[in-house]
Structure formats: structure tokens, C-alpha cells
Amino acid sequence: MSSRTKFLLFVLMAAALLPCIAATAESEDSAAVPASPAAVNPVAEVRNARSWEYGPFVNWGKGVGDRSDFDFLWGGIQLAKPLTPVLHAGIFSGQFEYGGNIMPLWLAFTPAAHEQTFLYGGTAYTQPIGGGTYVGLSLTPVIFRWNFLTQSRHFQPWFQAAGGLVYTTHKFPPDVLVPHGTDGGTSVWNFSPQGGVGVHYFLRSRRSIDLGVNAVHISSASLGDRNPGVNASVQIQVGYTFWK
């Protein structure tokens, strides 16, 4: 396992523990303070009101494994709303939330186009491979999120599972180049199933900064003649949320 892959796995594990650490860090302080009005407890305020939430975010990501030389930069707007009251299930108590996002900024930075030598039937041959910067946009219409019940007045941890669609102006990911209009290559349409964890940190009433880490898979589901995909990438997300 390369040092880069180990670093990405460390970041993912650290982010997964962050919500628990944050909630624990504030639990003692919260326990010492009498029940507060919603105005001074931003987390309880939006939880009880089941408030709509919306805001901008930006993602920076890195491919894993055989895609470790892929980098990603995405940006967009997210909209969501809790659909249930608090559901009690021990340490898993929390609220179910449904949301979606759109990313008009979708960039993938891959190695430059080059020629690659293949061995087939004992014979070596060379073919051109695409590459460079890929531009597109993405829509994630399904985000299922679980907001954990917390006593903290500032931290709201969560985990989520989601599914989206990606369109790129050129077939992605790069593969063996074929003449335009002929069969072969990958697809301009890809799917992006994903899952991750994160936390809202409330700066004040109805305003939070957000940090999340997602593991994202990108695949065309064989819409193209070839489907090498991006089996795994780690995406770090930073955002700002307004609650209404």
C-alpha cells in the first residue's frame, strides 16, 4: 500500500471519528448548563423545527488505488430537510433527513494523454490513451442522511448514503482513444454512488460551517463499450449552511 493511499485512509478514519469526538467534547459542558432556550441552542433549534437547510460547498478529492493519480475539484449547492422527529435507538438515536445537490463545477485532473504499450497473445502493441482535465457537472438527487441526536449546542454529527449522475464533455474516465463516431471507449454519462460522514458546526442561530468526508465510486454501468470507472475516491467537503 502506497504512502499516499495510507494517508487518504487515515484522513477517512479520522473524519469518521470526528463527530463522536466533537459530541463527547461538548457533552460535559452541555450537561452542566440548564436547559437552554432554542435561541441559545442552535442545534436543538433546527432539530425541533425540522428546518430547511441550503448552502454552497466545495469538494477536493483524490483517487485511490489504480486511480491515485486522479484529482478532483467540485463545487455546488445543497438543499435538504429533516423528515422525521427524533427517533430513539440508543446511541443511534437521531433524525432522518432527505436532500440533494447540484454541482455545476465538476473537474477531474488526470495524467496527460499518452501512448501505452499492451501485451496481447505474446505480442506487444501501442495505443493512444486519453487524459488531461475533464469538465462536467453533476446532479445528486438522492441523499439519505442520519443526523445523530447530540447534547451539544454547536456540533451536529451525521452520516449519509447518496447516489448521483455525472455528465462530462468528453468520455470519462480516459481510456483507449477511438475515432469519433465509432464504437469503443467509455461514456460521457457516469453514476456516482457514495457514502460518508460529517459534522455541522453552528457559529450562531441558523448558521453553520460544515465538514464532511465521502467515499465516491464513479461508473458508467457499462453505458459505454468499456467501463474501467473510478472504483474509489476520497472527497473532502467544506460548506456553509443556512437554516430556514
Name every feature range the model reports, one short phrase each.
Residues V58-V64, I102-A108, G163-K171, A215-S219, ...:
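Transmembrane beta-strands of outer-membrane beta-barrel pores
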Residues K62-G65, Y125-G132, L177-G185, A221-P228:
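Extracellular loop and loop/strand-boundary signature of outer-membrane beta-barrel proteins
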Residues R50, D69-G75, T133-T140, F155, ...:
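Residues that define the transmembrane beta-barrel architecture of outer-membrane proteins
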Residues K81, W146-F148, V199-Y201, Y240-F242:
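Residue-level signature of outer-membrane beta-barrel architecture
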Residues M1-V46:
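Cleavable N-terminal export/targeting peptides
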